[in-house]
Swiss-Prot record:
It comes from Deinococcus geothermalis (strain DSM 11300 / CIP 105573 / AG-3a). This is NADH-quinone oxidoreductase subunit I. NDH-1 is composed of 15 different subunits. Subunits NuoA, H, J, K, L, M, N constitute the membrane sector of the complex. It is found in: Cell membrane. The keyword Zinc-finger does not apply. Binds 2 [4Fe-4S] clusters per subunit. It comes from the Bacteria.
Length: 179
């Protein structure tokens, strides 16, 4: 019985040897994300006015099960408005180490300001760098927002096109890390 079992095992191994591999050579090869993929948070603007869509209602913070979102609202200046409403988000922070990417904040947002984009490469050296502020999440009107909503409507997967930085990072020169 022992030789027959070894032959069966070797047959499985040899059969898998000539199949296409499941993994990819990341980061040289990029994967195609599914239409409903939820990545890094993005705050959007109105395409016609360029004003922020976030009105500082804090519904996203209230619905977050991980308590990862902090919103501080302020009154909007009528002469120089930041958002179209009476209020705007003076402070909008999200702790990406606490976020579980559930998408409840995106569903709760009444203006569609919070969108979970396609970016998933969020590596850094310090945990404090994972707390993203409003400036880190706002995207411009020119359409730099990942086309996640369009992919959800059409059902076609989104192809990633991020550039991978190569070479030395001058901002990290001279930094010593504990061993």
């Amino acid at each position: 019985m022992g030789v027959l079992d070894i032959a069966k095992g070797m047959g499985v191994t040899l059969g898998k040897l000539f199949q296409k591999p499941v993994t990819v050579s990341y980061p040289e090869e990029r994967v195609t994300l599914q239409p409903r993929f939820r990545g890094r948070h993005v705050l959007t603007r109105h395409p016609d006015t360029g004003l922020e869509k976030c009105i500082g209602c804090s519904l996203c913070a209230a619905v977050c099960p991980a308590y990862a979102i902090y919103v501080e609202a302020a009154e909007n200046d009528p002469l120089n408005p930041t958002s179209p409403g009476e209020r705007y988000a003076k402070v909008y922070e999200i702790n990406m180490l606490r976020c579980i990417f559930c998408g409840l904040c995106e569903e709760a947002c009444p203006t569609g300001a919070v969108v979970l984009g396609n970016e998933f490469e969020m590596a850094d050296y310090r945990s404090r760098d994972f707390v993203y502020g409003k400036e880190d999440m706002l995207v411009g009107v020119e359409g730099s927002l990942p086309q996640r909503r369009e992919a959800q409507r059409t059902g076609k997967p989104v192809r990633l096109g991020f550039k991978v930085p190569k070479g030395p990072r001058p901002e990290l020169e001279g930094v010593e890390y504990p061993r």
